[in-house]
Amino acid sequence: MSLVESPPWQALKSKYQELSSLHMRDFFAQDKKRGTRLSLEAAGLYFDYSKNRVDEKTIDLLCESANACNLPLRIEQLFSGKLTNESGEMVGFHTALRQVNNFSFKTNNNAIQEIHASWEKIKKLSIRIREGDYKGFTNKSITDIVNIGIGGSSLGPQMAYNALKPYVKAPLRCHFISNLDDTDFYETVRTLNPETTLFIITSKTFTTKETLENARRATEWLMQAAKKENLIQTHFMAVTAAPEKAHEFGIQKDNIFMLWPWVGGRFSVWSAAGLSLAIAIGWEEFFEFLRGAHAMDTHFRQAEFNKNMPILLALLSIWYINFFHAKTQAIIPYSQRLVYLPDYLTQLHMESLGKSVQLDGSAVHWQTGAVVWGDLGTNSQHSFHQLFLQGTMVIPVDFIAFLKNSRESHWQLPLIANCLGQSQTLMEGYDKEGVMRDLINQGIEHEKAEKLATYRLIRGNNPSNTIILEELNPYSLGSLLALYEHKVYVQSVIWNINPFDQWGVERGKHLAKDILQALQAETDQSSFDSSTERLINYVLKIKGNRP
């Protein structure tokens, strides 16, 4: 029986018909304790999901659907290393990377031992650099760490580093290079001293074109200063699942950190892919980062579905995507330090859930995934919230706020006030009675107020979740990221798709090689469609290679 034919799914269709014409204002008016009932705390996070177009029966039916999809079994597979891809290879065992309680998994004990060995190696390097004992080619201590990677090899470490800057030990600084455009590289190193700069090359296969090209630029940049190749070897580290390729590139074996094949890039910040972060904030704080994620893992694994934060977050997303036909979801963090979080979550959701084939190879017959995007509040309020408030689409929003940015900072009350004000407005709207009252109180005549009111109405009934943490620290950040990882995994289970591959992006890479040859006037263009051929010829014309 397919997902859409299951009894809970059919019941959800009827529930949608019942609720689609109702307004959330009425839910709150009829239930004064709705905000209390539809909220929970776990792993240092407070989650309010009361501003959603659901009642308790909806939640029950969504949970029944999850059970019908064997979610309990699939959760245990996630934590036991029993998930495999179409080739039978283990995937999705990233939860082992933050197993901090010295507990041995029932299977894959070798993997756990390798992880613990990696922890020790990361810890030792972190201490050496932070204490100034790791030297460059002129015997000066390292001050700048440049992470070269792309996708998950860059988005995760950069996001986490920016979020945890108050925990970075001066004078250490981290920088991140990912783009093939050489502007990214040269603008990053422009103010750096090659004598005190360490490059971390992160690539699972060590064949990623963008990463290797930037690594080559780093080699040339260091050689201009050091003059001798043997002098720059201490300025390179590699994180990869292909250590032999890293060694062939010129990285010393002792400077190569393992990234296992069963760790996907977008789930790799917990591994040595987070080496730059571990060095910057120190091993103890990095371990707190892992502990926070592990706390969310434990909650996800143990809590009942209707009290399970990742599961509820996933089920609500499915509710809007598959029944309200929402095409997009927004993430709005109210903290400058989380400026890269929307980009990180965009990749996590869209690479994982952008699939149209089920696990058995058959076609998917229901919508999967959505466009996930966002920006910082309050900036976003002056940018695109207008579409949320007075547009015509249903756009679910996740608001994320911290009461304090760090132990030393003041309470973020103005930010919290704006965050809560946006969520309330999205829910209740601004009806004509309220608009008219406020306009008349401003001294505007009734007739003019009638005309103005039409343009100021806000329909409301737009759903949102609010996630609040007391403080933005390594533990809370780890918990938050694990929350969204598990949310995405639950969605993939219910949709019966593989969240751990991204084959779609490979075809474009392959075609880029052929197109580059054509742009270099080395091949004919008969294999390209007329549009691509025309574009190639236009570029060649501008270059002067064509009349």
UniProtKB/Swiss-Prot annotation:
GO cellular component, one term: cytosol
Associated pathway: Carbohydrate biosynthesis; gluconeogenesis; Carbohydrate degradation; glycolysis; D-glyceraldehyde 3-phosphate and glycerone phosphate from D-glucose: step 2/4
UniProt xrefs under CDD domains: SIS_PGI_1, SIS_PGI_2
Active site (record annotation): 351 (proton donor), 382, 509
GO biological process: gluconeogenesis; glucose 6-phosphate metabolic process; glycolytic process
Key words, A-Z: Cytoplasm, Gluconeogenesis, Glycolysis, Isomerase
GO molecular function, one term: glucose-6-phosphate isomerase activity
Cysteine pairings via disulfide bonds: none
Keyword Cytoplasm listed: yes
Catalytic activity: alpha-D-glucose 6-phosphate = beta-D-fructose 6-phosphate
The protein's Enzyme Commission number: 5.3.1.9
Pfam families noted in UniProt: PGI (PF00342)
InterPro entries in alphabetical order: G6P_Isomerase, G6P_Isomerase_C, Phosphoglucose_isomerase_CS, SIS_dom_sf, SIS_PGI_1, SIS_PGI_2
Keyword Membrane on entry: no
Compartments, record wording: Cytoplasm
Top-level taxon of the source organism: Bacteria
Family: Belongs to the GPI family.
Summary of the function given for this chain in its UniProt record: Catalyzes the reversible isomerization of glucose-6-phosphate to fructose-6-phosphate.
Name the record gives this protein: Glucose-6-phosphate isomerase
Organism of provenance: Coxiella burnetii (strain CbuG_Q212) (Coxiella burnetii (strain Q212))
Lineage, opening ranks: Bacteria, Pseudomonadati, Pseudomonadota, Gammaproteobacteria, Legionellales
